[in-house]
Amino acid sequence: LVIDKRSHKGGNLYCEDVDGIHVHKYGAHIFHTDNKDVWDYVNALVPFNGFINSPLARFQDKLYNLPFNMNTFHQLWGVATPAEAREKIKEQCAAYSHIVTPSNLEEQALKLCGKDVYERLIKGYTEKQWGRSAKELPAFIIRRVPLRFVYDNNYFNDRYQGIPEGGYNELID
């Protein structure tokens, strides 16, 4: 028995057909797994495309790769190696070492990734998302910031990724 709160099947995966386009009513959902058996199973039900999510963030008319990775760090500081990026982050975080227990999201982010990443790539997005200042948000919201020291813009680390070619409704049916 599956009980869905919404008036349609599929919950947040529900897709609406708008002029032949599958629109994810509640935001994009990208299926991802490292388990080949799971991937083979869902692909036996419906075909998936090979969509890879490689988002960009814009700050002051410059584009930055997400999640935070070596491409991002090169864009921010011109560094080329993981050691250089780690050193730059360590230097920036040192300015906030006096913060033992962060009392808000801003302090937590500054302690985890430093001023540049926070101000250019976290602060504005977070405040827009929550409709409040990062200083008013609890620290637990951003317990960790994934910092990847590889040149890979793939949002997920999983080997198998995609979206059902016919939309999620076909998979759910």
What are these regions (language model features)?
Residues Y14-C15, F31, K135, L171:
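Short, electropositive, low-hydrophobicity segments enriched in small/polar residues
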Residues I3-K5, T33-D34, G166:
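Short His-Asn-centered micro-motif
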Residues D19-Y96:
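Dinucleotide-binding Rossmann-like beta1-alpha1 core, especially the glycine-rich loop
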